[in-house]
């Protein structure tokens, strides 16, 4: 970005992250969430069409605190990784990996990186398994990413790409609405 002159280097996530996700052993009543490859963190009630989850055994679930990342190690290769920007603690399946990034990293910058084709390529290089491939934390920690010490530059880059994502989403909604309108007109016209 213009105005920034600090060097960039390739660093590994293990230098800036730690595995978190304590288990909900006391069966505390936190909302249960899943990680979607499209919507990020999504309420399990919403994901499963309003099904009642009150009787769900939640003692094996893991906490995801605000500003932590969670991912499905068997589906991260298709984008099942999310950032908790909900402003509240939630719980996720015990199968998920929960990660806290260092204060040296801007979370939006990292979120944009983990949506990138470069990250997905690195995921594929670092997975384990023959039938179903998994990205365990130890493998995630070895993935390299572009790093600058200038957090302000990280923030500007993250905000730039977030704004692009928001604009794309807005236009996608408009496109979907136009398609539905066209479909309605066609149905009325050719009845």
Where are these regions (language model features)?
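Short amphipathic coiled-coil heptad-repeat segments
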Residues: 1-6, 10, 173-191
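Non-catalytic DNA-recognition/assembly elements of restriction-modification systems
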Residues: 1-25
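DNA target-recognition patches
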Residues: 21-54
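A short beta-sheet element
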Residues: 48, 53-119
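A short glycine-rich beta-alpha junction/loop motif
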Residues: 90-95, 128-153
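Extracellular/lumenal glycan-associated surfaces
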Residues: 155-167, 171-172
């Amino acid at each position: 970005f213009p105005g920034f002159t600090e060097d960039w280097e390739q660093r590994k996530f293990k230098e800036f992250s730690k595995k978190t996700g304590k288990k909900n052993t006391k069966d505390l009543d936190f909302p249960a969430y899943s990680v979607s490859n499209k919507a990020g963190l999504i309420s399990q009630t919403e994901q499963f069409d309003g099904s009642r989850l009150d009787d769900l055994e939640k003692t094996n679930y893991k906490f995801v605190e605000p500003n932590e990342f969670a991912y499905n190690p068997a589906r991260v290769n298709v984008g099942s990784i999310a950032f908790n920007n909900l402003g509240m603690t939630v719980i996720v399946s015990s199968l998920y990996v929960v990660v806290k990034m260092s204060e040296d990293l801007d979370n939006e910058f990292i979120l944009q990186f983990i949506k990138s084709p470069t990250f997905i390529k690195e995921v594929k290089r670092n997975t384990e398994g023959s039938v179903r491939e998994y990205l365990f934390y130890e493998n995630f920690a070895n993935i390299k990413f572009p790093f600058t010490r200038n957090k302000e530059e990280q923030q500007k880059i993250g905000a730039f790409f977030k704004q692009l994502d928001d604009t794309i989403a807005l236009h996608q909604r408009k496109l979907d609405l136009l398609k539905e309108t066209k479909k309605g007109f066609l149905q009325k016209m050719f009845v």
